[in-house]
């Protein structure tokens, strides 16, 4: 993919956005801090997501972290350590709002994960539709070791991805797992050599983008919405979205 940097109407210090034909790459860009998430970084990511929402020429998005050491090493402890209860709740709500907005984006998002995906980093990856990890990737929800709980949706998304029992084990122990175990438990979709990570992510994104975009959007909606309701309502949602395809420009 030939990419170009996008000049947005505000300066971004911590998040980079590149766009190519039908595809975009979003990079959390704080390598000296292992791409840890500050409130400023979350607000910048929110702004980038807004840009992606409004770009109808994009069909798929790749989200990654700068450098090989870390996808995102969690929320920035330097910012969190002095928060009181109310401030911490507001920080958690900010992260959850941004991650939920990413999750609800009308385009598929692929997380390309190298190095650490810890705490908020693991939660960010879980907010994406598909996760591709390098062999060097490491995953954990280690918050209990700091006397807190996952605050950006980890208690909910991890259980939905790997089952309640395994999620409780990982959260209660704070244990770090390697990429191959993450694959075995269903936390990631694919594990590849580090040098092939972005190539694999772009290949999958290109394949997705080669399909009908409205059908992809409706498929995402049907899956995500259906998981939140009972099976009878979920089937109705699928039927409704199936019908919408026949009024779209994509159909046949």
What are the functions of these language-model segments?
Residues 103-216, 248:
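Crotonase-fold acyl-CoA enzyme core
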Residues 41-44, 91-94, 124, 197, ...:
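Hydrophobic alpha-helical membrane-association signature
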Residues 1-64, 100:
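Conserved CoA-thioester-binding segment of acyl-CoA-metabolizing enzymes
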Residues 48, 94-106, 112:
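Catalytic-core regions built around general acid/base machinery
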Residues 1-21, 55-56, 68, 174-180, ...:
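C-terminal alpha-helix plus adjacent terminal tail
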Residues 26, 30, 45, 63, ...:
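Terminal peptide-recognition signature
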Residues 32, 36, 43, 75, ...:
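Residues at secondary-structure transition points
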Residues 4, 57, 65-101, 117, ...:
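Glycine- (often His-adjacent) and acidic-residue-rich active-site loop
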């Amino acid at each position: 993919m030939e990419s170009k940097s996008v000049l947005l109407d505000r300066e971004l210090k911590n998040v980079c956005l590149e766009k190519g034909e039908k595809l975009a790459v979003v990079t959390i860009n704080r390598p000296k801090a292992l791409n840890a998430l500050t409130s400023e970084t979350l607000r910048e990511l929110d702004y980038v997501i807004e840009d992606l929402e409004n770009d109808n020429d994009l069909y798929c998005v790749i989200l990654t972290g700068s450098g090989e050491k870390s996808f995102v090493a969690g929320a920035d402890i330097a910012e969190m350590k002095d928060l009181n209860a109310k401030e911490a709740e507001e920080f958690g709500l900010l992260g959850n709002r941004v991650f939920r907005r990413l999750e609800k984006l009308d385009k598929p998002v692929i997380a390309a994960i190298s190095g650490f995906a810890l705490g908020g980093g693991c939660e960010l990856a879980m907010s994406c539709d598909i996760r591709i990890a390098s062999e060097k990737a490491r995953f954990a929800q280690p918050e209990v070791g700091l006397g807190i709980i996952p605050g950006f949706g980890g208690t909910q998304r991890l259980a939905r991805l790997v089952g309640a029992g395994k999620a409780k084990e990982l959260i209660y122990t704070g244990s770090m797992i390697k990429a191959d175990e993450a694959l075995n438990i269903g936390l990631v979709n694919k594990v590849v050599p580090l040098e092939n990570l972005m190539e694999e992510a772009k290949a999958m994104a290109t394949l997705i983008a080669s399909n009908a975009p409205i059908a992809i959007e409706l498929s995402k909606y049907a899956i995500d919405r259906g998981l939140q309701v009972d099976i009878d309502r979920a089937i109705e949602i699928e039927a409704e979205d199936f019908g919408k395809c026949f009024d779209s420009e994509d159909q046949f």
